[in-house]
Amino acid sequence: MDIRSYMASPGEGPLDNLKPDGGLCGIFRTMGCIGDSLSSGEFEELDADGVKHYHDYYEYSWGQYIARAAGIKVYNFSKGGMTAKRYCEEFAESRGFWNPELACQAYTIALACNDVNHIELGSADDIDVSDWHNNKPTFAGYYGQIIMRYKEIQPKARFFLLTLPHGFNSKNADKVSPASQIIRDVADKFEWTYVVDLERYLPPVDDDFRRRFYLGGHLNAAG
């Protein structure tokens, strides 16, 4: 056995050595997945009248696959169509997601897909790191509020922020890279906060990708 095969090597990319057992996610006992449809195991349905419907099937979400693979507890703090603004203003409160009894050792935040269509992006300067009540009402401000409120609940939690992949949003494609850069800038403002850089490392969302990983016009659970 070569023990080096279990260690990160210089220059190794995040997709170069995939771990079927959940990898180092297993060091956490609890994880919360904050996000939209892409954190919710979404399925697009086309009914007999040609009308599209969208369904959250959390058991198919990548968070629950991590839970089963790594043997940890994962909470889906997510819903299709979610934005950072809605999460802060009503969704999390209505679902009890600010409840300290649901405090997690780690959180993933996968938001921006819908935000780029509905709100000013702003910048990381919209965040008052001393008091989230002073954050500006922009995507960046609400995004920062989410981190800060969960840090109040679990000060030692680790946060993993997901950027947006290229090619998934044709409506506001020009906002995808700026939104991803804001997410990177937000991560720099907080301790124990890291970036899962899908924009940099994810395979391109091209026609072949869509054929394999889409149901209609929406990513399927595998995608």
Segments from the language model and where they lie:
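Serine-esterase "nucleophile elbow" of acetyl-processing enzymes
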Residues: D2-S78, G96-F97
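Structural recognition of the beta-strand scaffold that forms the well-ordered cores
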Residues: T30-G35, S39, V74-S78, Q105-A110, ...
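Solvent-exposed loop/turn segments at secondary-structure junctions
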Residues: S37-S40, K79-K85, C113-H118, P165-N169, ...
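Acidic/histidine-rich helix-loop elements
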Residues: S40-Y57, S78-R86, S123-N134, G216
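Oxyanion-hole/transition-state-stabilizing segment in secreted/luminal serine hydrolases
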Residues: R86-P137, G167
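Generic structural signal for well-ordered alpha-helices
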Residues: Y143-M148, S180
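Proline-centered flexible-loop/turn and helix-kink motifs
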Residues: P155-K156, E191
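Catalytic His-Asp segment of secreted/periplasmic serine-dependent ester chemistry enzymes
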Residues: L164-G223
